[in-house]
Swiss-Prot record:
Keywords from the UniProt entry: Ribonucleoprotein, Ribosomal protein
Lineage: Bacteria, Pseudomonadati, Pseudomonadota, Betaproteobacteria, Burkholderiales
Descriptive protein name: Large ribosomal subunit protein bL17
Keyword set includes Flavoprotein: no
Cellular component annotations (GO), alphabetically ordered: cytosolic large ribosomal subunit
Entry similarity comment: Belongs to the bacterial ribosomal protein bL17 family.
Organism: Janthinobacterium sp. (strain Marseille) (Minibacterium massiliensis)
Stored Pfam families: Ribosomal_L17
HAMAP family the UniProt entry points to: Ribosomal_bL17 (MF_01368)
Top-level division of the source organism's lineage: Bacteria
Length: 131
């Protein structure tokens, strides 16, 4: 029986699943928005929300925990310098998952995952082109 097992296996071994979710977490922190399948997006939310909560408290122990989960020094620096202060007053709910329809090849449900309260880059582009 599968009762009370909340983990999605995503048809992968545990090491592949861990590596995939770690890579997706680093990509989301780097670009602040990614496109993926809906089940992967929902599982990514379970991984990245506690990491973003770690970034709100700047301590050596939290930095070591974040590095242990991310394995990317540049993203740990961004997490504590930029993202932690941005979400200091928000208690969870750091991600927005938007459904995007279905993938052409296999009809898999797709999702757009982005960090909430991310700065708009389109306004800066429009301001530069107007000058």
């Amino acid at each position: 029986m599968r009762h009370r097992h909340g983990l999605r296996k995503l048809n992968r071994t545990s090491s592949h699943r861990l590596a995939m979710l770690r890579n997706m977490t680093v990509s989301l922190l780097r670009h602040e928005a990614i496109k993926t399948t809906l089940p992967k997006a929902k599982e990514l939310r379970r991984v990245i929300e506690p990491i973003l909560t770690l970034g709100k408290t700047d301590s050596l122990a939290n930095k070591r925990l974040a590095f242990n989960r991310l394995r990317d020094r540049e993203m740990v620096v961004k997490l504590f310098a930029e993202l932690g202060p941005r979400y200091a007053n928000r208690n969870g709910g750091y991600l927005r998952i938007l459904k995007m329809g279905f993938r052409v090849g296999d009809n898999a449900p797709m999702a757009f995952v982005e960090l909430v309260d991310r700065p708009d880059t389109t306004e800066a582009v429009e301001d530069n082109s107007g000058e």
